[in-house]
Amino acid sequence: MSKNDHLSDDELSLFREAVQGSKKLQQDTIIHQPSKNFSDLQQQRKSLKEGKNEEFFFSDEFVPLLSEDGPIRYARDDVSKYEVKRLRRGVYVPDVFLDMHGMKQDEAKRELGSMIAYCLKENISCASVMHGIGKHILKQKVPLWLAQHPDVMAFHQAPLEFGGAGAILVLLSIPDR
């Protein structure tokens, strides 16, 4: 029956007589969820992508070529050595500090990825990673992980005021938005 069809008075009274005494059923099995907004779906996809990118870049098998003489340092090919010198001197002041003391390698890798993702999201260009000295496990791994990330421009052992031999200052490239 379409909406344009009209019931006659006899048909309407016959229907009311037939359903007289019946109770309205309570619908309790199907839950109607509101349709999702397209922007909500885009936001969910973006957050999933960011979550995947937090740990994606760090491999334990890949070993980049880092200088073994002197304090730990690294600069991409397109980065001036002057930037590394500025990191060493403490010209760049870190806005974010990541303390890895007591973390296991997997946890440290995940936190490092989260810190880099946070810095990129908040447009923070300099961060400090405090790996500590301890058994030298994280002290050896953190530079290898940082050198693999495409947004890390350079890093250098931190000056004494930012942690000295137990920390690394990281310079990140912030994409133009």
UniProtKB/Swiss-Prot annotation:
GO terms for biological process: rescue of stalled ribosome. SUPFAM superfamilies: SMR domain-like. Belongs to the SmrB family. Keywords: Endonuclease, Hydrolase, Nuclease, RNA-binding, rRNA-binding. The lineage of its organism: Bacteria, Pseudomonadati, Pseudomonadota, Gammaproteobacteria, Vibrionales. Its EC number is 3.1.-.-. One of its GO terms (molecular function) is RNA endonuclease activity. InterPro entries: Smr_dom, Smr_dom_sf, SmrB-like. This is Ribosome rescue factor SmrB. Gene3D superfamilies: 3.30.1370.110. Acts as a ribosome collision sensor. Detects stalled/collided disomes (pairs of ribosomes where the leading ribosome is stalled and a second ribosome has collided with it) and endonucleolytically cleaves mRNA at the 5' boundary of the stalled ribosome. Stalled/collided disomes form a new interface (primarily via the 30S subunits) that binds SmrB. Cleaved mRNA becomes available for tmRNA ligation, leading to ribosomal subunit dissociation and rescue of stalled ribosomes. Residues 98-173 form the Smr domain. SMART domains: SMR (SM00463). Pfam families: Smr (PF01713). The keyword rRNA-binding applies. Associates with collided ribosomes, but not with correctly translating polysomes.
